Amino acid sequence: MSIMQASCIALVSSLTLTVIFLPLLIKFMHSHHEGQEIRDEGPKWHQKKSGTPTMGGTIFVIAAVISVIWVTAWQHSLNKVVWILVISLLGYGIIGFLDDGIKLYYKRNLGLRAWQKLALQIIIAVVIVLIASSDHFNFGLYIPFAGVVHSVALFVIFIIFWLVGFSNAVNLSDGLDGLATGLSVVAYGTYAYIAFKQKNFAILAFCMSVIGGLIAFFIFNHKPAKIFMGDAGSLALGGGLATVSIMLNRPWSLLLVGIVFVCETASVIMQVISFQTTGKRIFKMTPIHHHFEMLGWSEWKVDIVFWIVGLVGSILYLAIWG
């Protein structure tokens, strides 16, 4: 069986598990009157989404983990790379699960405090570094225009920054029905293609497993969303993406492949700096998808335009660097 055939089985497995169990989670949350609390600072028309079931990411994360483990084990390819990817996805997913759980329990929009979330994110990143370093891991980091720099300290700092940064970047992008889901399908699809070209079955199977779960999740997450992925999904997706880019030895690719995630994060940083220094806001509201909403764009229009931008970023990367 070819690596693509086995990876497609992983995709179908993850998709099937998500389709089966996600409706059960939605039904459970409705029966217990559990749902997302919408922040007051967001667009006023988002308040009608209050009470929508959340934590849907828990299902597709578990589905992806189960699928990639059993398919790689079946193909005798369950190696350290698979475990690093699984720990990344599951580890950041657990942080998000705790965050979502606190929000639901206390019926508020605030979950883990910022320092608590950051500390846990750093711990997961350090665990990944420790696991990778136990197998003669290459700590060379390519710096654009400077070449490869061999520094363990620099590489460890970079991995922590990359994983924490992109887990939060995807989290910031999860503000509209289906937005982060579609963007993640494009990004993971791009890395699946790269992994296939490199004949890296572990990463290919992982990406396809995540894609399968996301495709199934989108059925319930497109506007009007029947369930949100919550931090359990968005933090996991971002952590997984960052780890995949590093394991493929192409970390900088994420600046183009994940260009929308980068722009969402940059808009928040720019807004804060501008307001703190000049008292003026650059955007009507951040993250930037809300800015376009405030300009009168519908959610579907924002989704489609942002998905296209994400796709163009991925195509540009593949066209230039393959």
Swiss-Prot record:
Single GO biological process annotation from the record = regulation of cell shape
Instruction: Give the enzyme's main class according to its UniProt record, as a single word.
Output: transferase
Which subcellular locations apply to this protein? Cell membrane
The record ties this protein, via InterPro entries, to: Glycosyl_transferase_4, PNAcMuramoyl-5peptid_Trfase, PNAcMuramoyl-5peptid_Trfase_CS
GO: which molecular function terms?
metal ion binding; phospho-N-acetylmuramoyl-pentapeptide-transferase activity
Q: Which residues cross the membrane?
A: 6-26, 54-74, 82-102, 122-142, 145-165, 176-196, 200-220, 227-247, 255-275, 302-322
User: Among its keywords, does the record have Cell membrane?
Assistant: yes
Lipid bilayer topology: Multi-pass membrane protein
E.C. designation(s): 2.7.8.13
Q: Which pathway?
A: Cell wall biogenesis; peptidoglycan biosynthesis
Q: Which CDD domains match?
A: GT_MraY (cd06852)
Cellular component terms per the entry's GO annotation: plasma membrane
Q: Does the keyword Transmembrane apply?
A: yes
Cofactor entry: Mg(2+)
Task: One Pfam family, please name it.
Answer: MraY_sig1
Q: Which reaction does it catalyse?
A: UDP-N-acetyl-alpha-D-muramoyl-L-alanyl-gamma-D-glutamyl-L-lysyl-D-alanyl-D-alanine + di-trans,octa-cis-undecaprenyl phosphate = Mur2Ac(oyl-L-Ala-gamma-D-Glu-L-Lys-D-Ala-D-Ala)-di-trans,octa-cis-undecaprenyl diphosphate + UMP
Tell me the keywords, alphabetical order: Cell cycle, Cell division, Cell membrane, Cell shape, Cell wall biogenesis/degradation, Magnesium, Membrane, Metal-binding, Peptidoglycan synthesis, Transferase, Transmembrane, Transmembrane helix
What does the UniProt function comment say about this protein? Catalyzes the initial step of the lipid cycle reactions in the biosynthesis of the cell wall peptidoglycan: transfers peptidoglycan precursor phospho-MurNAc-pentapeptide from UDP-MurNAc-pentapeptide onto the lipid carrier undecaprenyl phosphate, yielding undecaprenyl-pyrophosphoryl-MurNAc-pentapeptide, known as lipid I.
Task: Report the family membership.
Answer: Belongs to the glycosyltransferase 4 family. MraY subfamily.
Q: What is this protein called?
A: Phospho-N-acetylmuramoyl-pentapeptide-transferase
Natural source organism: Lactobacillus helveticus (strain DPC 4571)
